[in-house]
Amino acid sequence: GIGKFLHSAKKFGKAFVGEIMNS
């Protein structure tokens, strides 16, 4: 459902921000 999608999006967003911070 949408909740699962939002959870995945949040996880992906965190990873994305982490990549930006590390570069």
UniProtKB/Swiss-Prot annotation:
Tissue and organ distribution: Expressed by the skin glands.
Major place of residence: secreted
Source organism superkingdom: Eukaryota
One GO CC term, this protein: extracellular region
GO process annotations (BP): defense response
Cellular localisation: Secreted
Keywords: Amphibian defense peptide, Antimicrobial, Secreted
Family recorded in the similarity comment: Belongs to the gastrin/cholecystokinin family. Magainin subfamily.
Function: Antimicrobial peptide.
Name of the protein in question: Magainin-R1
Phylogenetic lineage: Eukaryota, Metazoa, Chordata, Craniata, Vertebrata
